[in-house]
A protein has these predicted regions:
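Hydrophobic helix-rich structural segments at or within alpha/beta enzyme and signaling domains
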Residues: 174-303
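Alpha-helical/coil-rich non-catalytic "connector" segments in signaling and regulatory proteins
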Residues: 1-182, 201, 243-245, 281
Length: 303
């Protein structure tokens, strides 16, 4: 829905009925405030029922705090006719978005949660508008105004929390990359690293057969960051090789990555399987090691 159609839903300040619409909106806000606990419980239930990925026990308290904070903000604004550009997102909402980003829960889940919640709140608004002591025409005008206002609020708050979510996701990815790089370095230089610790920190088991590879972009622009491209290539190669699990990928620089594949016994090293991936990226080069097992094999396949 574009901003023009949303704006048409909101009552114009110059409209003859503007003052009365805003008064009735405030009345609706007061009545919704009296039902705060009911609305809060209903909105949480709607989100939890529709989105299993947000129901991890340690995330539920943060979800509930975010929902409560958003409801309080919305009702405060419509009861007091406060413009959107005069409000800040609640701490609970931004903290929840940050945590979802760090957990690598998709941004689409956060966006959907806001739409589930806003739809639920709109249903309560509709109930209260129906109970207003005014003409049906004015009730419809109030409902249109509230609907347009809610769409503007959701558009604003989702843009805010999605930015926070991306910052959290990026921070977590950088932290994980640092941990993985440190563990790989320890193994390659022969430090005493237990297989259990390595698997816990990197998600990759040292006991299985490994096939190491070096990926790089030949003559890459030093100013271009090819990290995401190399990570995508690593995953694509894992699929082509028939690997049962995701590869372990550590970034050396902006155009180079070291990768270990959990190689199946019947992995396909034919040039066709490799070239099918290489040819999609200009300048991409792949150097494969030999398939070897265990901690020593992890090192030997790389070197």
């Amino acid at each position: 829905m574009n901003s023009g159609s949303l704006q048409r839903r909101l009552v114009s300040p110059d409209a003859p009925e503007a003052q009365e619409v805003h008064r009735l909106v405030s009345v609706v806000g007061d009545r919704l405030q009296d039902r705060f606990a009911e609305i809060n419980a209903s909105m949480n239930s709607a989100i939890e029922a529709g989105m299993d990925e947000l129901n991890e026990p340690d995330l539920l308290d943060m979800l509930h705090a975010s929902v409560e904070g958003n409801i309080a903000t919305i009702l405060h604004m419509i009861r007091n006719d406060i413009p959107l550009d005069h409000v800040q997102p609640t701490t609970a909402a931004t903290e929840y978005a940050d945590r979802l980003g760090q957990r690598d829960i998709p941004a689409s889940s956060l966006r959907r949660a806001y739409h589930f919640g806003s739809d639920d709140l709109l249903a309560f608004m509709f109930e209260e508008v129906q109970g207003l002591d005014c003409s049906p025409e004015l009730q419809l005008r109030v409902l249109h105004h509230l609907s347009g206002w809610m769409h503007k609020y959701v558009d604003w708050i989702t843009r805010v929390v999605l930015e926070v979510h991306e910052e959290g996701r990026r921070f977590s990815a950088e932290q994980n990359a640092t941990v993985v790089s440190a563990m790989v370095t320890k193994v390659l230089r022969g430090d005493d690293v237990s297989a259990r610790e390595f698997a816990t920190r990197t998600g990759y088991a040292l006991e299985r057969p490994h096939l190491a590879a070096t990926l790089w972009i030949d003559r890459a622009n030093p100013g271009s960051d090819n990290t995401a491209v190399l990570e995508t290539v690593a995953r694509d190669l894992a699929v082509r090789l028939g690997c049962p699990r995701p590869p372990l990928c550590t970034i050396v620089d902006r155009s180079t990555a070291w990768v270990w594949f959990a190689a199946p016994a019947d992995h396909d090293l034919s040039s066709g399987a490799i070239h099918a991936v290489i040819e999609t990226i200009p300048g991409l080069r792949v150097s494969l090691g030999t398939c070897q097992s265990g901690v020593d094999g992890f090192r030997a396949s790389h070197f």
